[in-house]
């Protein structure tokens, strides 16, 4: 599915824009601060309900306006889908799909699987386990119909359990929460483990292309001891959890550990190499989704030329073209992306929030 039309109103520094898009490569060229990243962020927000540069809604809505409005048209193989998102300064959202209100942001996310590559995206590799859990959970969300409900219930139960830990004195008082929590934790961990095992070879092969000088390994850690039942872990660690007032073990502590030549990648790779690894992982994940489900990602790439030499830029471009996916690329100069352009691509110029093609 590709985004054929994008309407933006009062988002960041963009007052209004109406863009007809290519199903292939779309280039956004402009100086720093021109608004090219804001276009990428508008697309991301339309599919996620939140921006990727700021969680504060007031910074995303254009100055002195009350709300932003985003609309898009998605073209699938058999039908077109109209989608829309409005969000005001209070954080209240309205999601519209095919002319009807009352939809959830998760429905937009399901319609628009995306891979985001930004200069800030190093957090996937050096920002702690929660970013790698998000990497795994993105895939589980798009591959397992029951994942989102299970994940939402898990978060709710963990919050309730942590609150209860401040009040209880005996483990038996926690059993009502743990009775619900344990099967959810085990199911989510199973989904994550199955996905990690399934994509491991793809990640290794793609990383080998981008970083042939390193031997990269990937290891899923579920968040509690291997070969131990989660029920046993919760009961055994009750006193420790009660002192900490939070649940110290579980799927909320899971990680995907990535090592280069046996050492953590954040301690081994340069910034340029970390960006290559990030690109490789995002690409592998998108390709895996297509192979498993037939669905294609949208790829959003901010500041394409940053920290990549000509050879690696060419490699990334050729791999992206091979996916036959829709790609949005921002760059300071058209020279950085001209060799990626073909007869089906579109080049947009962005200047002070105004977008022309």
Curated annotation (Swiss-Prot):
SUPFAM superfamilies in UniProt: P-loop containing nucleoside triphosphate hydrolases (SSF52540)
One term of GO molecular function: single-stranded DNA binding
Xref: HAMAP family: RecF (MF_00365)
Main location: cytoplasm
Amino acids binding ATP: 30-37
Lineage, opening ranks: Bacteria, Pseudomonadati, Pseudomonadota, Gammaproteobacteria, Enterobacterales
Name of the protein: DNA replication and repair protein RecF
A GO biological process held by the record: DNA synthesis involved in DNA repair
Organism per entry: Shigella boydii serotype 18 (strain CDC 3083-94 / BS512)
Protein family per UniProt: Belongs to the RecF family.
UniProt-annotated location(s): Cytoplasm
InterPro entries membership: DNA-binding_RecF, DNA-binding_RecF_CS, P-loop_NTPase, RecF/RecN/SMC_N, RecF_2
Keyword Amino-acid biosynthesis tagged: no
Pfam families: SMC_N
Annotated Gene Ontology cellular component terms: cytoplasm
Keywords, alphabetical: ATP-binding, Cytoplasm, DNA damage, DNA repair, DNA replication, DNA-binding, Nucleotide-binding, SOS response
Gene behind this protein: recF
Protein's job: The RecF protein is involved in DNA metabolism; it is required for DNA replication and normal SOS inducibility. RecF binds preferentially to single-stranded, linear DNA. It also seems to bind ATP.
């Amino acid at each position: 599915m590709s985004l054929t039309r994008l309407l933006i109103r009062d988002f960041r520094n963009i007052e209004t824009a109406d863009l007809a898009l290519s199903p292939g490569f779309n280039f956004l060229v402009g100086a720093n601060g021109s608004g090219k990243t804001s276009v990428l962020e508008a697309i991301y927000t339309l599919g996620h309900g939140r921006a990727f540069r700021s969680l504060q809604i007031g910074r995303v809505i254009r100055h002195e306006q009350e709300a932003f409005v985003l609309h898009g048209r998605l073209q699938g193989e058999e039908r077109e889908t109209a989608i829309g998102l409005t969000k005001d300064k209070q954080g209240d959202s309205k999601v519209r799909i095919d002319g009807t209100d009352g939809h959830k942001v998760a429905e937009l996310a399901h319609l628009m699987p995306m891979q985001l590559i930004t200069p800030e995206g190093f957090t996937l590799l050096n920002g702690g386990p929660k970013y790698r859990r998000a990497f795994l959970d993105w895939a589980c969300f798009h591959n397992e119909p029951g994942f989102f409900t299970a994940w939402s219930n898990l978060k709710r139960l963990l919050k309730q359990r942590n609150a209860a830990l401040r009040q209880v004195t005996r483990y038996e008082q926690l059993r009502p929460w743990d009775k619900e929590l344990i099967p959810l934790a085990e199911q989510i961990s199973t989904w994550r483990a199955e996905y990690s095992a399934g994509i491991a070879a793809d990640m290794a092969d793609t990383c080998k292309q981008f970083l042939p000088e390193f031997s990269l390994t990937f290891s899923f850690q579920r968040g509690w001891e291997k070969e131990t039942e989660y029920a046993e872990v919760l009961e055994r660690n009750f006193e420790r959890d009660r002192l900490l007032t939070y649940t110290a073990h579980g799927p909320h502590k899971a990680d995907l550990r990535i090592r280069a030549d046996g050492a953590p990648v954040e301690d081994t790779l340069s910034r340029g190499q970390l960006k290559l690894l990030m690109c490789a992982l995002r690409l592998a994940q998108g390709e895996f989704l297509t192979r498993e489900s037939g669905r294609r990602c949208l790829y959003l790439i901010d500041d394409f030329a940053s920290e990549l030499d000509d050879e690696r830029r060419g490699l990334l471009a050729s791999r992206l073209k091979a996916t036959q996916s829709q790609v949005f690329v921002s760059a300071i100069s058209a020279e950085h992306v001209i060799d990626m352009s073909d007869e089906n691509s579109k080049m947009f110029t962005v200047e002070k929030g105004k977008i022309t093609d």
